[in-house]
Amino acid sequence: MATMAAEPVFVDTNVLVYAHVAEAPWHQEAQEAIADHEAAGAPLWISRQVLREYMVSLTRPQQFPIPPELTTVVAQVQQFQQRFHVANEGPEVTTRLLALLLEVPTRGRRIHDANIVATMLVYGVRRLLTNNTDDFVRFAAFIEVIPLVPPPASEPPPSA
């Protein structure tokens, strides 16, 4: 009997940062989520955009009380390129991004999110692991958003 391979998962920048910075919120959750998808055999994807955003986040002085050394960040990015499938942003991604912007009107910094979705679509990845679920709700017709931290259960209504 043949088994189906787990569907690929795209890892958003915030999850990558949380997983690799011990002081970050949701550090343990991010590490476990990545490990769980790996254990299930899901190919894990990132993009060149995610690599750039990771470097920006970790080297911004105001981000962490003691920012990591640049050599550490560079070494981590080199490791990510070995550990994850890395999607390149060629002309196909730009073409898909432009079409996506017309399908789901998006402006300003949200275009970065649209670019991630366009990259995913070009590479056939339909699942996104992120802690910024609200940023991707508008693209629900195209991708499945997997929340890093499930939303809290709604509180029961007060009794009368």
Describe the residue ranges of each PLM region.
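Short, well-structured N-terminal submotif of metal-dependent ribonuclease cores
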Residues: M1-I46, Q62-A75, R138-F139, A153-A160
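Acidic, PIN/NYN-like endoribonuclease modules and their adjacent C-terminal/linker elements
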Residues: M1-M4, P8, A114-A160
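Active-site neighborhoods of divalent-metal-dependent phosphate/nucleic-acid chemistry enzymes
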Residues: T3, H85-N131
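Alpha-helix capping/helix-boundary segments
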Residues: V15, V50, V93, N115-I116, ...
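Hydrophobic helix-cap positions at the C-terminus of alpha-helices
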Residues: D36-H37, F80, L100, V104
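Structured helix-beta-strand junction loops
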Residues: A40-G41, F80-R83, F142
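Short beta-strand segments at enzyme active-site cores
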Residues: W45-R48, T130
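Helix-adjacent hinge/juxtasegments
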Residues: V56-N88
